[in-house]
């Protein structure tokens, strides 16, 4: 029997998850059916209950349900617990539901594919919302020399930094405190790119050979990546690889087989450019 999987979100029309998982399934010879489902904002739990009752094996979760999925799961992986959000649910053999968060590992794997080395580097994370919280543990497990979380509201960044201090050298700063600081990797975890905006960053922030990463993506370089190029970044990347990477981790956790990320990423990138 074909195993059923889905992604839940609202909105959901734009989701690339079904085509990503279809390509993974074809590549690995796995028999599965993956759909996208628009879920009423106040009906997450009952829709998830119905999905699993009808034989569904696993779910990906996107905006705005990641916190709700966190509460819905009967058990959580340590990284999901840290992230405070869940983008992955799986039904275990005893019928219980386990929640995980594959966003951070998706980003880290993408950086590995790009040959970016995180160990020993000074890393600047922009933003202190759910996207940043979701990537902090996997990022710190790569042993950077330092991670600075910069945010408009300093108290939010401070609270986040405090929660991860046991995993490495993490500190918080306001954007106005970044003058004179220099970083090897800058990661934009704000949604500013979606609105064509840029966090208020000073000039001369980048060390020679610096890498800049935007969790958002589009057919054209985001405003943040345009800034990075103007500032002399040696390497830039958007979040399309993170999207495929988190999906690959989910696929592996469901099917115990690791799909090839690069051909899927290449196909998606081509589709993006064709739509321009």
Curated annotation (Swiss-Prot):
SUPFAM superfamilies reported for this sequence: Aminoacid dehydrogenase-like, N-terminal domain (SSF53223), NAD(P)-binding Rossmann-fold domains (SSF51735)
Catalysed reactions, semicolon-separated: shikimate + NADP(+) = 3-dehydroshikimate + NADPH + H(+)
Keywords (A to Z) from UniProt: Amino-acid biosynthesis, Aromatic amino acid biosynthesis, NADP, Oxidoreductase
UniProt binding sites for NADP(+): 127-131, 151-156, 215, 239
A GO BP annotation: chorismate biosynthetic process
Gene Ontology cellular-component terms listed: cytosol
Organism, scientific name: Cellvibrio japonicus (strain Ueda107) (Pseudomonas fluorescens subsp. cellulosa)
Complexes and interactors: Homodimer.
GO molecular function, one term: NADP binding
EC number: 1.1.1.25
Annotated InterPro entries: Aminoacid_DH-like_N_sf, NAD(P)-bd_dom_sf, SDH_C, Shikimate_DH, Shikimate_DH-bd_N, Shikimate_DH_fam, Shikm_DH/Glu-tRNA_Rdtase
Class of this enzyme: oxidoreductase
Full protein name: Shikimate dehydrogenase (NADP(+))
Residues annotated for shikimate binding in this entry: 15-17, 62, 87, 103, 217
Similarity annotation: Belongs to the shikimate dehydrogenase family.
Pathway(s) annotated for this protein in UniProt: Metabolic intermediate biosynthesis; chorismate biosynthesis; chorismate from D-erythrose 4-phosphate and phosphoenolpyruvate: step 4/7
Organism ancestry: Bacteria, Pseudomonadati, Pseudomonadota, Gammaproteobacteria, Cellvibrionales
General function of this protein: Involved in the biosynthesis of the chorismate, which leads to the biosynthesis of aromatic amino acids. Catalyzes the reversible NADPH linked reduction of 3-dehydroshikimate (DHSA) to yield shikimate (SA).
């Amino acid at each position: 029997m074909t195993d059923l999987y889905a992604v839940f979100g609202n909105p959901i029309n734009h989701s690339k998850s079904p085509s990503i998982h279809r390509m993974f399934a074809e590549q690995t010879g796995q028999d599965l059916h993956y759909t996208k489902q628009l879920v009423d904002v106040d009906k997450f739990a009952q829709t998830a209950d119905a999905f699993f009752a009808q034989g569904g094996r696993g779910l990906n979760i996107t905006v705005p349900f990641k916190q709700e999925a966190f509460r819905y799961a009967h058990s959580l992986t340590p990284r999901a617990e840290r992230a405070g959000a869940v983008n992955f649910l799986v039904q275990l053999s005893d019928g219980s539901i386990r929640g995980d968060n594959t966003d951070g590992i998706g980003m880290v794997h993408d950086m590995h594919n790009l040959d970016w080395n995180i160990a020993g580097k000074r890393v600047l994370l922009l933003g202190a919302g759910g996207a940043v919280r979701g990537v902090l543990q996997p990022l710190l497990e790569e042993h950077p020399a330092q991670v600075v979380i910069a945010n408009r509201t300093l108290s939010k960044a401070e609270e986040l930094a405090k929660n991860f201090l046991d995993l490495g050298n993490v500190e918080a700063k306001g954007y106005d405190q970044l003058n004179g600081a220099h970083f090897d990797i800058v990661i934009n975890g704000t949604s500013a790119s979606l609105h064509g905006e840029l966090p208020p960053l000073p000039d001369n922030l980048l060390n020679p050979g610096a890498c800049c990463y935007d969790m958002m993506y589009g057919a054209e370089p985001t405003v943040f990546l345009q800034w990075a190029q103007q500032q002399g970044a040696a390497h830039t990347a958007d979040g399309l690889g993170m999207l495929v990477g988190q999906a690959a981790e989910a696929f592996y956790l469901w099917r115990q087989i690791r799909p090839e990320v690069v051909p899927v990423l290449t196909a998606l990138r081509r589709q993006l450019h064709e739509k321009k």
